[in-house]
Amino acid sequence: MKFFAVYSASLLLLFSCISHAQDAPFVRFNDGPGEWQGQLQTAIHSYRDSNGRELNLVSAIHIADAEYYSLLNEFFKTQDLVLYELVAEPDQRPGPESNVAGSSPLSLIQNLVARALDVEFQLQQIDYTPANFRHADLSPAELGRIMAEKDESFFTMVLDVAIAQQASAQSRNQQQGEVSISSLLMALSSENQSQALKYLLARELGRAESLLLDPQLEENLTLLGDRNRVAIAALIDALAETDKNAISLFYGAAHMPGLERVVLELGFKASDQSWLTAWAIQ
C-alpha cells in the first residue's frame, strides 16, 4: 500500500527513528500486559577503544516523557563531552523550560505533536547549557544551502525512504506498514482513543528496527548523511583531546546506524547496551 509506505516514512523521518535490520537496534517497542499498552524505548550503545576511552551513542526520540529526558540529563553529567544534534547556531543553547520551539519546520511539527500526545519536546527538557556540551551539527544556513544544492526537500526525502521501504518489504514478502485500516478504526473507536492512537504510533516507530535502508541512500539524504559527517568530524576532533575519556554522541536514533559504522572503523568495539523508556503507554 503506497499510502502506508509514505505514512511510515513520514513518521520515521519526523521522529528520527529510521534504523536498519541488525542484531543491536537503536529503537524498539515492547507490548504491555493490557490493551493499548506498551513501551517505546531507545538505546545507549557503549564502545571502547584500545586506550580505554568510552564512547556512547545515545539515541534520542525528539518527543517523549519528561522522565526520559530527566534520565538523559543525569547521564550527561557523567560525561567528559556530549556532542549534540541541533540544527542551530553553535552559540544557541536551549535549557529546560526555555520555551524554545525550534526554528525548523520539523521542530515546529514535533512540538505540536508533543502537545497532542501529552509528551514533552526535547528542546524544552534537555539542558544544553553545561560546559561539557558541544554543538556537532549543521547551522540552519548550512542545511538550507546543502538541500538547495541537491534540489532536496522533506517531501522528496519522504518519497525516497518510502520507495526504499516498500522495495525492502516486497523483497522479504512482508506487508508494507504495520498500521492497517482495521487497527486504526479500532483505535478511533476505543474508549481511550488518545492512548490507542499513541500506541499505534509508538508501535510504528519501534518497527524501525526491522527496516532495511540502503546505506548509500542514507548517506545521500541531507538530514542523515550530511549531518552525520559533521558529527563524525566533531568526534574526531574530540578524540584528539587527551582529557576526553568519556564521550557521548547524542543524536536521533535515525542517525545511529551510519554513526556506528564509522565508530567501528575508528577502532572502537561494542562493550555495553542499555535501554531507556521514551514513551510509557499505560
What positions do the PLM features span?
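Structured, acidic catalytic/metal-binding patches in enzyme active sites
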Residues: Q22-D226, L266, D272-I281
